[in-house]
Curated annotation (Swiss-Prot), chains A, B, C, D:
Its cofactor is Mg(2+). PANTHER family: ATP-DEPENDENT 6-PHOSPHOFRUCTOKINASE 3 (PTHR13697:SF52), PHOSPHOFRUCTOKINASE (PTHR13697). InterPro entries: ATP_PFK (IPR022953), ATP_PFK_prok-type (IPR012003), Phosphofructokinase_dom (IPR000023), Phosphofructokinase_III (IPR012829), PKF_sf (IPR035966). It comes from the Bacteria. Mg(2+) binds at N119. Pathway: Carbohydrate degradation; glycolysis; D-glyceraldehyde 3-phosphate and glycerone phosphate from D-glucose: step 3/4. Catalyzes the phosphorylation of D-fructose 6-phosphate to fructose 1,6-bisphosphate by ATP, the first committing step of glycolysis. It catalyses: beta-D-fructose 6-phosphate + ATP = beta-D-fructose 1,6-bisphosphate + ADP + H(+). Disulfide bonds: none annotated. The lineage of its organism: Bacteria, Pseudomonadati, Spirochaetota, Spirochaetia, Spirochaetales. The active site is at D143 (proton acceptor). Transmembrane segments: none annotated. This is ATP-dependent 6-phosphofructokinase. The gene is pfkA. Its EC number is 2.7.1.11.
Length: 366, 366, 366, 366
């Protein structure tokens, strides 16, 4: 393999942190340095670091031992450079930030910018590409909702954590004859609730893609009771919607929520179940625990695979792409195809039928 | 060893479930059956089962494979037979329940009742003993707040779970430069927060026994920032009190809390920190996750030890006692010494100085 | 959905146990009973139970709580009914056993036999099908070497366990500046070594499919040393072969092994490395630890999916098939296509290039 | 608190690595630096680093994030400076090394040397103290065999790992109706086998302190079989001895072992059981897995406690001591009391009776 004239790339992580970021960083940088002889510029705290010029030359030894570590050694932020800051009238600040990014990109003599992030990150990546920069994206998120890839790294680690939590609640539910409601992440996509719900043996799974009726939930719990199962586990995605809510506009939903006192969806579901059935019901919100800790072996493998594939794209100068997994193969898809889309659970996804077959209820009366 | 005329004992688990209950049940029953030839009556769902006569003869094979399981195969409840039900004017119901217990105790031909539980359970046990029953208690609780024993089973499993949660939050805190507040159980005793806080490397630990001032917390966070530590972990016992609150009556505190909108103490602390420091602050409430799952090896050992010691008390007819660990040895202490007391963290406990020595702040300005 | 005239199926687990067997049993039986109204006959200890008529009618409640449990509640054995017992001259015993199986199949009024197992199990299943029985297979094995499916359940749990072990060895290797050799399962297929090797950051991975030269291994270790890495992790599949061995006949290899004193391949590799490099080298054989314990969420999902798919095949009367995963979808493939084949790691598998890209050596000088 | 004139201490880790070393290092250094204003010299790879002068000034920030990490950031070695190297006629090399240590101790202007290690380390520490150096010791070892302290850090982490391994073997044992032998560390002391054996529900536990007879083991396994328990778990300390062996001299034992082909004690026990009972028996040697990985919360607490106590000894100039835990309190005991002693399991240790009470056999016919 003939080596190209030495290239330099910047690398940053953006959006919520998730397991596997460091493994992916390691994959990109090890392959890019040792295999292709490139130079690595590490950018701190996502796009914010690129705006502020917070960047430095790195050596593979800076990535020693990070394969197993949670978080991101580069730091991250939720900075969205194309979005005006709250309170600003127009996009002036936005353009100022984008200009700073472009300026720093050139000052740092980057041939390409490698970004690791979720939907927001890739939207920005696409806009930067249109603004003339070379960009390569890697799909990370515990939500698994990035369009174009079968799976994102971080997702399976979160599934592991949520499943372990459900396992723990099982013993408490059983000991006390209780309904235990567990709320997991997923505003618009129910992947995490679906996977962890099946893996944890959840009796009811509520996801944003399948609106639920309380009546069906109640019926399912009572049928279980009649069969001698005095406890139940209910797995709720934070963005789950009742049929009623699903017919409302976003504004109406917001208003309704303000009126109710439930901090989150899990609390609401727990309250309604207890009221309707008289069963003792408790709620657990998993929250930030889903993001942290060492990545699972699956995610280390996937992140390493994505990372080395990104290095190859760098080498080939094949910019403007996001690496993705499709049918077991790593491919590269144009950023333009990814931006502004969301991968939600299709109602006919085979896992939904799998779950129903073992007796799980989605609150929709099927 | 000469075997006594066969004895029969009832066994029940009462109060919140916690890891190690099954291990303790196994310890009592295996030793009582095989070593001492006793008969075992399993009572369902705590004192409620004894009131309702929900009990059956068990064989050691019913306890196969339970050493590692969370929860309790006997089921539990928070039934307090001596307490009138809400709405009842006097203790009529209470006496009715107690009478039912005494009646069933004799109907089942019990020589002794073995109860596994926390403070409430042992208070009831003491009252039953005074009412003429033979009772032996085993101290379980994740709070470690039972007077008379150095440690309860369930505690170290909860410490493990809470510490693992703190470990996970560390990576998120670090990646985002955030203050992560984690609320753990402990209404009146801060053992769990103290142990998990030190084991997890918490920067600030707030426990009921040491009233905190926000000013000291803020100062500590800012000092860390000046030393380049942009993130911090704050471990809060659910019953932590500010100095102000610590001077209030229980009623005043309740009123104050109603006025504020914070669902729990962790939320309040997080809100105040963010407001006072401007640092991005997030809260995680560990909740029921602390109760569930397989007991840690430490708790399996301790529960087995307590269980076999209880069997020996049964054999010797040494009733009216709770088994306990003191300076590494299992001893038996009179129920009367345990009831109505609470073991909280003494302000001069050596672990508090240990924590301070590695830089942990308790919010008290020391 | 119209229910068929009630069907009855037998279910057995055969071959080495692995995580996910119980989850798959639960999937088949729950779906078959509740969705399709079938009757379930549980057969003990694999084909041996069918030979001996060790079987009984089961109810879904017999499968309560088994989703998370390792092992198999049905028990297993390595009985191969078509193979004569050692010492027998011809296949008389074989035919006797097969006749007993056929007889018991009819005595139990089975409409189909569901077998959960690996390559040997499916070979037998195919022969039984040819002998006139209806059979459906589910692919389990930690080796992932069953032809026709992208992945088997049990594999990812074993990857998790092996990776965790490698993580542990890392700290010891680092503290002592040692070469740590870890031997994992895989006689003919190197999937487990490959996956765990990458996920654990192994520096050298030796698998049966890529013959190794000691010289390349030594060179790689010394290069690492020159870069300041004083320790290394070597992941060895138990069936790894040196280039020399790969050119020998099976008999020659056996003879050679007898002459050497190494209990297993890992010991040999460790010895040769220490001798050739002078580096302190230690070996760990993971052994049975790879089979046990609770299945990973991934395997619970996959096993549940395979189980419910098998129930659907039962319902449709679509016999003579093994359920399989291909490109993310569950399909059914004829037993005849599976039997006698083995799925090994193709030398051009993308993960091998991924591993090389992050600096892993396969001992082949590439 | 009045600060002393700034002191400087060197710190090293020696002997086999174990979980909690980094936590203890962090405890000493954080407390010594922030609380007492001392200077820290980190010495690489145990006493070898002190011989070679491999040392450097450290700052608390060098210890950031190490609380949870396995291994030791200082590196370790098994260097015993007072022992002549193999092949040397007299102790010339020994004295040369000791002289180098003394020379470097003064060159580095150390006021004290803090050593973290096991029995060998503390023996050396005592000799160095007698040679005029100030030394403070911290007891680490997974074997828990250091005289003078109730427990060492590293021990409970190893118990956790070994127990988890036993849990895994349980499912395999059960699925196959097998006897599973697991060998854990412990040449002279059986603490680890005893603790993990009870916590894991081992049916037979063999430790060096209680010589075993095969006949009793066989009897116990057969009794279990008669009660319908077709599988058993046998936990063997690597230094377990049969009654016959216990009566031999060390030389005789060595000779006998050479004659037999068993690589380790676990293999021998497994072989003899299978031969004597006809039960299928398998062996697992846990090996280096017991040393690695993140320390358990218990060990992090204990190591932190020992570390900060050592810092206080440094501050008080209270040299020549090892920190220790006695009846829950941290104390300091003279090195001279510790050296040359070994803490083994007393035959009347209460845990042995606990184990017997739940049906565990120690192979001694009690």
């Amino acid at each position: 393999m003939k080596r190209p004239a030495t290239r330099t790339f910047g690398i940053l992580t953006s959006g919520g942190d998730c397991p596997g970021l460091n493994a992916a960083i390691r994959g990109v940088t090890k392959a890019a340095y040792w295999r292709y002889g490139m130079s690595i510029i590490g950018i701190s705290h996502g796009y914010r670091g690129l705006i502020e010029g917070d960047a430095r030359l790195l050596h593979p030894r800076d990535f020693d031992g990070i394969l197993t570590r949670g978080g991101t050694i580069l730091g991250t932020s939720r900075e969205k450079p194309f979005k005006p800051d709250p309170g600003e009238k127009d996009s002036e600040a936005g353009s100022r930030k984008v200009e700073a990014i472009i300026e720093n990109y050139h000052k740092l003599h980057l041939d390409c910018l490698v970004v690791l992030g979720g939907n927001g990150t890739h939207k920005t990546a696409y806009l930067l590409q249109q603004a003339g920069l070379n960009v390569i994206g890697l799909p990370k998120t515990i939500d698994n909702d990035i369009w174009g890839t079968d799976v994102t790294f971080g997702f399976h680690s979160a599934v592991d954590i949520a499943t372990e939590a459900i396992d723990r609640l099982h013993s408490t539910a059983h000991a006390h004859n209780r309904v235990m409601v567990i709320e997991v992440m997923g505003h618009k996509a129910g992947w995490l609730a679906l996977y962890a719900g099946i893996a944890g043996g959840g009796d009811i799974i509520l996801i944003p893609e399948i609106p639920y009726d309380l009546a069906h939930i109640v019926h399912h719990l009572q049928t279980r009771q009649q069969r001698g199962k005095e406890f139940s586990i209910v797995v709720v995605a934070e963005g789950a919607l009742s049929r009623e809510e699903s017919l409302m506009s976003k504004e109406e939903r917001k208003k309704r929520r303000k009126k109710n006192r439930f901090p989150t969806k899990g609390y609401e579901v727990a309250h309604l179940i207890q009221e309707a059935t008289g069963m003792e019901t408790r709620v657990t919100v998993l929250g930030y625990l889903q993001r942290g800790g060492t990545p699972s072996p699956y995610d280390r493998l996937l992140a390493t695979r994505f990372g080395t594939a990104a290095a190859e794209l760098l080498y080939r100068g094949d910019y403007g792409k996001m690496v993705a997994l499709r049918d077991g193969e790593v491919v590269a898809i144009p950023l333009g195809e990814v931006a502004e889309k969301l991968k939600t659970v299709p109602p006919d996804h085979p896992l939904i039928d799998t779950a129903r077959a073992v007796g799980t209820c989605f609150g929709d009366g099927v």
